[in-house]
Amino acid sequence: MRDFLRSSVARVWVPVLAAAAGMASLDRGTDPGDLVYFVHRGEQLLSGGWASTFADPMLQSGPLQLVLFGAVRNLSALAFVLELGTAALLLLVLGRLGVGDGLRLAAGLAAVGAGLTQLAFADGHPAEAVVPLLWVLAAVWARDDRVVAAGLLIGVSAGLELWGVLGAPVLLLTPRLRRAALGAAVEGVVVLAQLAPFALAGRMRMFEHEWRVTSGTLLGLVVAPGTHFGWPLRLLQASLAMGAGAVVATTMRRSLHVVWLVPLTVVVLRVLLDPVSFGWYWLAAEALALVGAALVLRELPSRFPAARLGPAAGTRRRAAAPPPVRS
């Protein structure tokens, strides 16, 4: 029992997941917005009419996310699955980055307290919080030269929401740049394998949807609100976001912080160049900010050793002083 109480499970996972569960219990009656629509589409995907799931151009979710929603179905249960799942993924990613128990506990509780886990359910778009965390994990694997696994994970993130493909720049963190192409190929195959069945067996109209530029966005300052914004412009938006991420990846590849700065760059450019603006878009930046803060705080003792050892050093100096002269 004593060993268990000293373990990271008892010191980190239990309190964070308990806090997330407590928040989820309060959210059971919350209206989760688009999540209701996604659940219905998920139920269709798991039915005999699965081939027509993406016949509605409005549906921009990935098939893996729909499978999860359709399988669980119950919104109260989804509150627990999504909120605890988001908290657990954050702790897992921080653990892979070598963050200690104390900082992981603080980051996990901050995620619950700041609303990251709660809004992952209540806003109805949990992928906004989950996808960037998967990118960070893929970046860690890419730095370890595990490009196949990294490409696979990025492809899986696109199965939640298609913009997950934008995580490709983290593949440039591999020690051998030529292998980044292998990871990108794996990512492409995974994405294609998820979407092809719907295109071959039914009507795949996801790419027929057009957005309209809204006021309050950067694009709204350049073009008139209401201007159509279709998939060709989405590809331009994606290219700019991924290009910026690639620049950060190649110029900062030696820094540990690159594993979250590349995803953050992509996320921020994606949001700033988007034709519409929703509050849940910023969940991605919040998740990455928690990862970055934990890494920065972990480095502080090594960067400022005097601050860490100041009191002890002062004690040693006083102890080393010569004794007073007695008359």
Residue ranges of predicted features:
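Membrane-interface alpha helices of multi-pass inner-membrane proteins
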Residues: 135-139, 147-172, 265-271
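Primarily membrane-embedded glycan-assembly and transfer machineries that use lipid-linked glycans
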Residues: 1-139, 175-282, 293, 297-299, ...
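Long, contiguous secondary-structure blocks with strong helical propensity
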Residues: 94, 145-147
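Long, intrinsically disordered low-complexity regulatory regions of metazoan
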Residues: 325-326
